[in-house]
Amino acid sequence: MAKITPIEFKVFTKYIFDICGITLKEGKEYLVETRLSPLLEKHGCVSFSEIYYKAKRDKDLEKEIIDAISTNETFFFRDVTPFEVLQHKILPDLIDRRSAARRPSARIPIRILSLGCSTGQEVYSIAFILRTLGLGTDVYDIRVLGVDISNAAIAKASYGVYSDFELSRGLTPAQINQYFLKLDEGRWKIKDEYRWLATFETYNIFDPSRQLGRFDIIFCRNVGIYFSPIDRIKMYEKIAAMLEPDGYLLIGATESLTYDTDRFIPKKYLRAVFYQPNPAKTG
């Protein structure tokens, strides 16, 4: 495996920050080496300097670098608690309010966003819950949007095919048979009734030209940890602008908004913490 020099690492950290906003601090040299070494071999580069200069002239290679660096570990129903609060607190409360406010014969709109959705496991976990609650009927107008900066991750999420190993992380055998169809040895495809609830798009939250609309619920778990404090503030400002006034924000179990923004108020439900817009900071 190729080794990155201190000068190359400094150049690459700025380059990666410029193209996707991810901050790589000193000590993350191993991450760059392990994730980009296969690209060096693929593109016939002998050093990180060589692949850097090649990527500056090749947008496709740049996308491959983004895919490699931004790939995160993910699995179905990761951390469990956010999905419990979604099923037992957030969705029931939201549906009650939307039902009371809807016009006769109008469908009840529910908009959910998964930021940094990676290969789709979080989005499909949400879809499983929606179906469990009986929300896939014509009474509801549901949109679950998963976005990620990685083209490769979005392609896999859209395809909805996972390995035995990927399904075993978070799902029981009964759930696997309920949610998936077996394609062949070791591969499963998500059933259409869940797949149809989800849409996936490539998206960079720091791109000012892209507007996704408004959402009732936003999942942004373990995304801010990759950004600088200044960029985290920018990210949460954008999330605040996308969230409905009575909406919900769910972040990672080890994350906190305390030092990044006062645009949200923490709420507790059993073991879970979720956030809602701060009325004093709206407008």
Indicate where each model-derived feature is located.
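Conserved AdoMet
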Residues: 1-113
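Residue-level signal for inorganic ion chemistry
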Residues: 86, 218, 243
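Conserved class I S-adenosyl-L-methionine
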Residues: 109-120, 145
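Extended basic-aromatic, gly/pro-enriched interface segments that bind polyanionic ligands
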Residues: 115, 135-219, 223-227, 231, ...
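Conserved SAM-binding loop of SAM-dependent methyltransferases across substrates and taxa
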Residues: 119-137
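A short glycine-rich, Lys/Arg-flanked "PGG" loop and its adjoining helix->strand segment in the class I
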Residues: 233-245
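Conserved beta-strand signature within the Rossmann-like core of class I S-adenosyl-L-methionine
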Residues: 246-253
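Core SAM-dependent methyltransferase catalytic element
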Residues: 258-283
